[in-house]
UniProtKB/Swiss-Prot annotation:
<feature type="domain" description="Tyrosine-protein phosphatase">
    <location>
        <begin position="60"/>
        <end position="207"/>
    </location>
</feature>
<dbReference type="GO" id="GO:0033549">
    <property type="term" value="F:MAP kinase phosphatase activity"/>
</dbReference>
<dbReference type="GO" id="GO:0004725">
    <property type="term" value="F:protein tyrosine phosphatase activity"/>
</dbReference>
<comment type="function">
    <text>Inactivates MAPK1 and MAPK3 which leads to dephosphorylation of heat shock factor protein 4 and a reduction in its DNA-binding activity. Inhibits MAP kinase p38 by dephosphorylating it and inhibits p38-mediated apoptosis in anaplastic thyroid cancer cells. Can also induce activation of MAP kinase p38 and c-Jun N-terminal kinase (JNK).</text>
</comment>
<feature type="active site" description="Phosphocysteine intermediate">
    <location>
        <position position="152"/>
    </location>
</feature>
<dbReference type="GO" id="GO:0006470">
    <property type="term" value="P:protein dephosphorylation"/>
</dbReference>
<dbReference type="GO" id="GO:0070062">
    <property type="term" value="C:extracellular exosome"/>
</dbReference>
<dbReference type="GO" id="GO:0045785">
    <property type="term" value="P:positive regulation of cell adhesion"/>
</dbReference>
<dbReference type="Pfam" id="PF00782">
    <property type="entry name" value="DSPc"/>
</dbReference>
<comment type="similarity">
    <text>Belongs to the protein-tyrosine phosphatase family. Non-receptor class dual specificity subfamily.</text>
</comment>
<dbReference type="InterPro" id="IPR020422">
    <property type="entry name" value="TYR_PHOSPHATASE_DUAL_dom"/>
</dbReference>
<dbReference type="GO" id="GO:0008138">
    <property type="term" value="F:protein tyrosine/serine/threonine phosphatase activity"/>
</dbReference>
<dbReference type="GO" id="GO:0070373">
    <property type="term" value="P:negative regulation of ERK1 and ERK2 cascade"/>
</dbReference>
<dbReference type="GO" id="GO:0005737">
    <property type="term" value="C:cytoplasm"/>
</dbReference>
<dbReference type="GO" id="GO:0000122">
    <property type="term" value="P:negative regulation of transcription by RNA polymerase II"/>
</dbReference>
<keyword id="KW-0378">Hydrolase</keyword>
<dbReference type="GO" id="GO:0005794">
    <property type="term" value="C:Golgi apparatus"/>
</dbReference>
Length: 211
């Protein structure tokens, strides 16, 4: 199991931090199913965090959050036997570095690899990778029998952010809809910087539809 206790502790800490912040969060009510969908219009970061704290918080080493699309952690990425069992054909590593992740790691499995060298920091610009990552995921799922693992160290922030961007770019989901779709299957908690970047993408896509 991936560290579900860690995820819950992180969510609890962030919730307390939000409440104690000098900038008061906007209060929302209701369950995950009652949260707004298309007509949000544009939630702020605190409202998104409230949505993230609601509903499923547990996770496995990998969870199928969209048909053929698995969101997971480094342990799953290193488990060749499990990758073969799941039929994974592509791996997108959102925590790529000289020490973590290479195409050679999947030699003999027929897996195509894309590494994104991203830092799980609110100051890191993940948005520059949104389109490239979404295109890679789309190509993987477009081929017959294609299945992709999108992962980072824990599978809740960097990789989750790229999966949300993919759902928004290729399936025209709003950010709220994308979060709800993923959280039906796995707890996630992108950092605040990533949430702001996803909000900017959401605004751009919504404004493009309205133009």
């Amino acid at each position: 199991m991936c560290p579900g206790n860690w995820l819950w502790a992180s969510m609890t800490f962030m919730a307390r931090f939000s409440r104690s912040s000098s900038r008061s969060p906007v209060r929302t009510r209701g369950t995950l199913e009652e949260m707004p969908t298309v007509q949000h219009p544009f939630l702020n970061v605190f409202e998104l965090e409230r949505l993230l704290y609601t509903g499923k918080t547990a996770c496995n080493h990998a969870d199928e959050v969209w048909p053929g699309l698995y969101l997971g952690d480094q342990d799953m990425a290193n488990n060749r036997r499990e990758l073969r069992r799941l039929g994974i054909t592509h791996v997108l590593n959102a925590s790529h570095s000289r020490w973590r992740g290479t195409p050679e790691a999947y030699e003999g499995l027929g897996i195509r690899y894309l590494g994104v060298e991203a830092h799980d920091s609110p100051a890191f610009d993940m948005s520059i990778h949104f389109q490239t990552a979404a295109d890679f995921i789309h190509r993987a799922l477009s081929q017959p029998g294609g299945k992709i693992l999108v992962h980072c160290a824990v599978g809740v922030s960097r990789s989750a952010t790229l999966v949300l961007a993919y759902l928004m770019l290729y399936h025209h989901l709003t950010l709220v809809e994308a979060i709800k779709k993923v959280k039906d299957h796995r707890g996630i908690i992108p950092n605040r910087g990533f949430l702001r970047q996803l909000l900017a993408l959401d605004r751009r896509l919504r404004q493009g539809l309205e133009a």
